[in-house]
């Protein structure tokens, strides 16, 4: 598809608005992404979700081959395991660059160009001749592959109205949770079949390249300011009226100024109690998701002596828990929709929190159950697998509700709030796999999981606090007071 078809056809000269400011023309203007046909909105959301899915899949599939990498290159397991952590650390740094790029050049190519480079680095990992190459290529695969992670949320906001976007955001969010649970299972199958760890990376590069081609062909630009700027430029050429312009061109932020904003403001927002507390909570549950890469391998692989594929199957229980929680979040959108209508279609952040309030208890219970039904205490694996399911339920409800609450609370500053959240949670998730294995070996899965469960209990009051006093807290915040209307 060319850009003209992406824009929905040739612009008409009479589309220029009064005052020489070019804008969309109401609900009938198909150039406005929020007026796209439902089918186009659905497949666009699906493409963005899959694009994000494969890079989060890449973050986890590597773990299945860690032991082989350690043996082949004669390094410790901890050094080989750093390949997982370095890619996730790349997730923390990349959005600081890609987010401002998308504000200047739109959503599509600032996401896809780095994504292509990330896929190339996956092939670099697959053909590596030493451990240094593996670690370097994994890190840069994370930096460049993080582009859709930082941009997809904005794309969904571009094309769905506030009342509609709850379900698409849940469906997108589940890809962040589901892909890391499938990665170890598929990776374990490659290892068990004798293909070796390199084919886990070849597979990653192949699926990312295929996704890149699909996106290049079928994804359309959706950033309203960029679309209106292009429209104004086209009208200036066709009419000769060079005073025509988009509202966004009156300020024309540069990439340098946006880079400064995206580097500084996210850390300023961490001083806000809402952003800080929810970032701590989401970072912890996200880190536990990646800690599972090690804890499951230890519990089901080493201690229960299951094979390389079977030992990864408990991730299916985690996935089922995530899907169950996603359904609960979608159901909560009915409640949210009623609150939105009652509030004159202005966001009601606190209406996002009920799933999180319940899910927090499931998360804590799951961690306790996993730890105290480990092989040292219970011979049957099923109680611990039920604990894994509850952990999945809790993770998804906490993660998705928190991000939706941040978007509704910080409105025009939501991108910075999400950037701060992404940075902190990625740093935490990258760090956990480095120490979970030695910690569990030293104090046991039971006490290790108990420590994590106790931390989660300390965080339980957060959604209740914001549900009751969130409006007052928002009204006092420099960045959140705009959501109090």
Swiss-Prot record:
<dbReference type="InterPro" id="IPR020846">
    <property type="entry name" value="MFS_dom"/>
</dbReference>
<feature type="transmembrane region" description="Helical">
    <location>
        <begin position="139"/>
        <end position="159"/>
    </location>
</feature>
<feature type="transmembrane region" description="Helical">
    <location>
        <begin position="447"/>
        <end position="467"/>
    </location>
</feature>
<feature type="transmembrane region" description="Helical">
    <location>
        <begin position="86"/>
        <end position="106"/>
    </location>
</feature>
<keyword id="KW-0472">Membrane</keyword>
<feature type="transmembrane region" description="Helical">
    <location>
        <begin position="306"/>
        <end position="326"/>
    </location>
</feature>
<feature type="glycosylation site" description="N-linked (GlcNAc...) asparagine">
    <location>
        <position position="241"/>
    </location>
</feature>
<feature type="transmembrane region" description="Helical">
    <location>
        <begin position="417"/>
        <end position="437"/>
    </location>
</feature>
<feature type="transmembrane region" description="Helical">
    <location>
        <begin position="269"/>
        <end position="289"/>
    </location>
</feature>
<dbReference type="Pfam" id="PF07690">
    <property type="entry name" value="MFS_1"/>
</dbReference>
<dbReference type="GO" id="GO:0022857">
    <property type="term" value="F:transmembrane transporter activity"/>
</dbReference>
<feature type="transmembrane region" description="Helical">
    <location>
        <begin position="199"/>
        <end position="219"/>
    </location>
</feature>
<keyword id="KW-0325">Glycoprotein</keyword>
<dbReference type="InterPro" id="IPR036259">
    <property type="entry name" value="MFS_trans_sf"/>
</dbReference>
<feature type="transmembrane region" description="Helical">
    <location>
        <begin position="172"/>
        <end position="192"/>
    </location>
</feature>
<keyword id="KW-1133">Transmembrane helix</keyword>
<feature type="transmembrane region" description="Helical">
    <location>
        <begin position="108"/>
        <end position="128"/>
    </location>
</feature>
<protein>
    <recommendedName>
        <fullName>Efflux pump bik6</fullName>
    </recommendedName>
</protein>
<comment type="function">
    <text>Efflux pump; part of the gene cluster that mediates the biosynthesis of bikaverin, a red pigment also considered as a mycotoxin.</text>
</comment>
<comment type="similarity">
    <text>Belongs to the major facilitator superfamily.</text>
</comment>
<dbReference type="GO" id="GO:0005886">
    <property type="term" value="C:plasma membrane"/>
</dbReference>
<feature type="transmembrane region" description="Helical">
    <location>
        <begin position="353"/>
        <end position="373"/>
    </location>
</feature>
<feature type="transmembrane region" description="Helical">
    <location>
        <begin position="42"/>
        <end position="62"/>
    </location>
</feature>
<feature type="transmembrane region" description="Helical">
    <location>
        <begin position="379"/>
        <end position="399"/>
    </location>
</feature>
<keyword id="KW-0812">Transmembrane</keyword>
<dbReference type="InterPro" id="IPR011701">
    <property type="entry name" value="MFS"/>
</dbReference>
